[in-house]
Regions:
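GHKL (Bergerat-fold) ATPase N-terminal catalytic module, capturing the glycine-rich phosphate-binding loop
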Residues: 1-138, 146
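GHKL/Bergerat-fold ATPase module in large chromosome/replication-associated machines
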Residues: 68, 86-107, 127-207
């Protein structure tokens, strides 16, 4: 074992929204990344497909199609659908310095910085709310609660907004059927299939 890689405290994910600054930050105290890992895993603006994806977003005025994400296979850069700029600060467990990565979609800047504990923070500098373009206000607590419940309820670590834990951390297939609502079944189906319609029916099978 490597004790320097053990997280400070229990592993968790925090959402921090600032309506005045128009930012949404996702913070964790996981293992973090080195500078080299940031370049390899995040600094992919110039890679094949990514520039085309960002260009497609700009051309999708009024139609923020989620299918673009699957088409180009660049999940992290789908953040540019809701943000003009992304800032990432990460510190690898066992290291004393952190790395700051920032991009507006046309390349990126990389520099050394500080972070109190190991882990990663991704900050989205949000575009203005635009209902016609499918952009909700991602600084609103009820919007964040809805998104986490719909898409991340069974993530195995707590996702917190201030003092509240937003997810159950238990997959619906591992819960007693009487504890799972019809809406949860419908939401889970849509999450898996990306189908906007409700399922015709559901069948519970235990093996």
């Amino acid at each position: 074992t490597r004790p320097e890689l053990v997280a400070a405290g229990e592993l968790e994910i925090r959402l921090e929204a600032d309506a005045g600054a128009r930012t949404l930050s996702v913070w964790d105290n996981g293992i973090g990344m080195t500078r080299e890992e940031v370049v390899q895993n995040i600094g992919t603006i110039a890679r094949s497909g990514t520039r085309e994806f960002l260009q497609a977003i700009r051309e999708q005025k009024g139609q923020m199609a989620p299918e673009l994400i699957g088409q180009f296979g660049v999940g992290f850069y789908s953040s540019f659908m809701v943000a003009d700029r992304i800032t990432l600060v990460t510190r690898k467990a066992g290291e004393t310095t952190a790395t700051r990565w920032e991009s507006s979609g046309d390349g990126y800047e990389l520099m050394e910085t500080e972070r109190d504990v190991a882990g990663t923070t991704v900050t989205l500098h949000l575009k203005p709310k635009d209902e016609e373009d499918g952009l909700r206000d991602y600084t609103e607590p009820h919007v964040l609660r809805d998104i986490v419940k719909r898409y991340s309820d069974f993530v195995g670590y707590p996702i917190c907004l201030k003092a509240d834990t937003l997810n159950s951390m238990k997959a619906i297939w591992a819960r007693p059927k009487e504890e799972v609502s019809e809406q949860e079944y419908r939401d889970f189906y849509k999450h898996l299939t990306h189908d906007w319609n409700d399922p015709l029916d559901h069948v519970l099978v235990r093996v």
